[in-house]
Amino acid sequence: MADENPLVGFHFAVDIQGVIKGYFTECSGLGSEHEIIEHKVVTEKGQEIVMKIPGRLKWENIVLKRGITSNMDIWDWRKQVEDGGVDDARRDGSIIMFDQGLNEVARWNFEQAWPSKCSGPSPKADGNEIGIEELEIAHQYIKREK
């Protein structure tokens, strides 16, 4: 196995089919997990053991954060779901990670995504932080392609 340097996690882009194309400052939720079912059995020798078997597969929601701008793309997409149009709002998309030379080095593709939550900044009169907006995306499937 060739030695590879770990990837830097701050160069990434988001491409959601026809809705969002841009850069975010933070991304989480690129994974899945199985519920664990404990199955109690008795062996031929009378010993009780607990076998753990995979249960229902669950995909984590993708959470994206970025500095707020005048761009309304995530809010317009969320409004589509709020108005009852979740089927029309479903989109496929990708999270793309780049190396320091901006060459694509990793890609996660997800399917049938829709915005389950959208929130804006929490302004404070005495603060000087950049306002952050957050988008949470539910989806049917995600796979690391590269």
Go through each PLM region and give its residues.
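Glycine-rich, low-complexity intrinsically disordered segments
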Residues: M1-K146
